[in-house]
Curated annotation (Swiss-Prot):
Major location (coarse): membrane
Protein name, as recorded: Neuronal acetylcholine receptor subunit beta-2
Listed result of changing V287M: In ENFL3; approximately 10-fold increase in acetylcholine sensitivity
Extracellular face of the membrane: 26-238, 283-296
Cytoplasmic side: 261-265, 322-458
Catalytic activity: Ca(2+)(in) = Ca(2+)(out); K(+)(in) = K(+)(out); Na(+)(in) = Na(+)(out)
Keyword Cell membrane assigned: yes
Disease link: Epilepsy, nocturnal frontal lobe, 3: An autosomal dominant focal epilepsy characterized by nocturnal seizures with hyperkinetic automatisms and poorly organized stereotyped movements.
Protein encoded by which gene: CHRNB2
Superkingdom per UniProt: Eukaryota
PROSITE patterns in the cross-refs: NEUROTR_ION_CHANNEL
Organism: Homo sapiens (Human)
Regulation of activity: Activated by a myriad of ligands such as acetylcholine, cytisine, nicotine, choline and epibatidine. Channel potentiation by calcium is stoichiometry-selective, CHRNA4:CHRNB2 nACh receptor is achieved by calcium association with topographically distinct sites framed by anionic residues within the CHRNA4 subunit and between the CHRNA4 and CHRNB2 subunits. Oligomeric amyloid-beta protein 42 activates specifially CHRNA7:CHRNB2 nAchRs. nAChR activity is inhibited by the antagonist alpha-conotoxins BuIA, PnIA, PnIC, GID and MII, small disulfide-constrained peptides from cone snails.
UniProt subunit comment: Neuronal AChR is a heteropentamer composed of two different types of subunits: alpha and beta. CHRNB2/Beta-2 subunit can be combined to CHRNA2/alpha-2, CHRNA3/alpha-3 or CHRNA4/alpha-4, CHRNA5/alpha-5, CHRNA6/alpha-6 and CHRNB3/beta-3 to give rise to functional receptors. CHRNA2:CHRNB2 and CHRNA4:CHRNB2 nAChR complexes exist in two subtypes: LS (low agonist sensitivity) with a (CHRNA2/4)3:(CHRNB2)2 and HS (high agonist sensitivity) with a (CHRNA2/4)2:(CHRNB2)3 stoichiometry; the subtypes differ in their subunit binding interfaces which are involved in ligand binding.
Length: 502
């Protein structure tokens, strides 16, 4: 019986020993907390200083957990940060050997004195941290407090290079009620921590430098400022905004290549202009309504709208020239020289003047007229009263050749002329009238074709000008942000005026 009870007693003794040790450890921590927070020796409303002139040094460091958003239009940056604060409280000290070598204890932060460090440039009225976590207190009185916070801070948005922009959003921390004669804020690290940072899909973190600011005119002022230097990832705006704008603008190039007879020049121009206006309205809803600067995309849209407006004006001029005729306008000699001879060669254009059948006939007729081959179509017989006339074979052949027809054989003996009836004079006059009328119409058509060719040359000239300005203007605008030297020094030393004391 004694042998059976021995193992059971051993197990019961071991269990009681563990229970007593756990209760003993819990009792030790409870005794320590009661000792530290005893109202007779500790008051959380009093600054932990032995005298009024002693400074309480508070070490501060920001750990960025997440860059939630940057609202450009409202100029607000929302961040999830952990605000590390360390200081010493001589009242929260103990001897570890008196409390089972317990060197650290966690105390509710609302039961101890806290430096009232708040975000000064807050944008929504939430100056405090989101959650009052426990503070870790060491036996030597050093306190480590790491509360999480979601801050909405005011951020001045620079829209000059949007969407290839880089922003500098600052977060200024300062004690709300204590000044430099009571609390000395010190940077724990020169840069904010990114150990627990979750990458953002819209922004890249360039640098997170911190600095301690003092006011030489006010010896009681001190604050800790962190510069959040962030660069936008432009892929989203490039795909959804810039590339469609470039493609729509390239459609305006086709306006100058479109024939004037089709009647769609003005329709295409106005359609492109309306599409660009829609994109301009989208931009106005994204960027802040500031008059200090114009965003890069806005500049490009205005640039393209000016080009499209220019294409509308030139299309009106081209259509006006295209529909000119000899009855309304006379072509000046310098117009013929410039637009029919000089510019076509420079624009790599070649007028098919010598390859058209009508043009070949026109040139042959003019050559015959210069040679005098058709000077006289008929000649009268001797005697004014005679009704006899003679057909001039050479004149008939010359006139036929002038119009590109084979001369008909003339019956009769091999003389130069033969007598004919008196009614032939009237027939010859009618033929002469028809020939003169056809010659006049042919000349008018030639002038009209010259005006159309002048319009074509003007169209081609403006086409090259538009392509040149559009391509080089686009490249020059969107390469401009790449040549900007974004350095941390530029942001840190730009317009940092001395802050005013509270």
């Amino acid at each position: 019986m004694a042998r059976r009870c021995g193992p059971v007693a051993l197990l019961l003794g071991f269990g009681l020993l563990r229970l007593c040790s756990g209760v003993w450890g819990t009792d030790t921590e409870e005794r320590l907390v009661e000792h530290l927070l005893d109202p007779s020796r500790y008051n959380k409303l009093i600054r932990p200083a032995t005298n009024g002139s002693e400074l309480v040094t508070v070490q501060l460091m920001v750990s960025l957990a997440q860059l939630i958003s940057v609202h450009e239009r409202e100029q607000i940056m929302t961040t999830n940060v952990w605000l590390t604060q360390e200081w010493e409280d001589y009242r929260l000290t103990w001897k570890p050997e008196e409390f089972d070598n317990m060197k650290k204890v966690r105390l509710p932060s609302k039961h101890i004195w806290l430096p009232d460090v708040v975000l000064y440039n807050n944008a929504d009225g939430m100056y405090e941290v989101s959650f009052y976590s426990n503070a870790v207190v060491s036996y030597d009185g050093s306190i480590f407090w790491l509360p999480p916070a979601i801050y909405k801070s005011a951020c001045k948005i620079e829209v000059k290079h949007f969407p290839f922009d880089q922003q500098n959003c600052t977060m200024k921390f300062r004690s709300w009620t204590y000044d430099r004669t009571e609390i000395d804020l010190v940077l724990k690290s020169e840069v904010a921590s990114l150990d627990d940072f979750t990458p953002s899909g819209e922004w890249d973190i360039v640098a997170l430098p911190g600095r301690r600011n003092e006011n030489p005119d006010d010896s009681t002022y001190v604050d800790i400022t962190y510069d959040f230097i962030i660069r936008r990832k432009p892929l989203f705006y490039t795909i959804n905004l810039i590339i469609p704008c470039v493609l729509i603008t390239s459609l305006a190039i086709l306006v100058f290549y479109l024939p004037s007879d089709c009647g769609e020049k003005m329709t295409l121009c106005i359609s492109v202009l309306l599409a660009l206006t829609v994109f301009l309205l989208l931009i106005s809803k994204i960027v802040p309504p500031t008059s200090l600067d114009v965003p890069l995309v806005g500049k490009y849209l205005m640039f393209t709208m000016v080009l499209v407006t220019f294409s509308i004006v030139t299309s009106v001029c081209v259509l006006n020239v295209h529909h000119r005729s000899p009855t309304t306008h006379t072509m000046a000699p310098w117009v013929k020289v410039v637009f029919l001879e000089k510019l076509p060669a420079l624009l790599f254009m070649q007028q098919p003047r010598h390859h058209c059948a009508r043009q070949r006939l026109r040139l042959r007729r003019r050559q015959r007229e210069r040679e005098g081959a058709g000077a006289l179509f008929f000649r009268e017989a001797p005697g004014a009263d005679s009704c006899t006339c003679f057909v001039n074979r050479a004149s008939v052949q010359g006139l036929a050749g002038a119009f590109g027809a084979e001369p008909a054989p003339v019956a009769g003996p091999g003389r130069s002329g033969e007598p004919c009836g008196c009614g032939l004079r009237e027939a010859v006059d009618g033929v002469r009238f028809i020939a003169d009328h056809m010659r006049s119409e042919d000349d008018d058509q030639s002038v009209s074709e010259d005006w159309k060719y002048v319009a074509m040359v003007i169209d081609r000239l403006f086409l090259w000008i538009f392509v040149f300005v559009c391509v080089f203007g686009t490249i020059g605008m969107f390469l401009q942000p790449l040549f900007q030297n974004y350095t941390t020094t530029t942001f840190l030393h730009s317009d940092h005026s001395a802050p005013s004391s509270k």
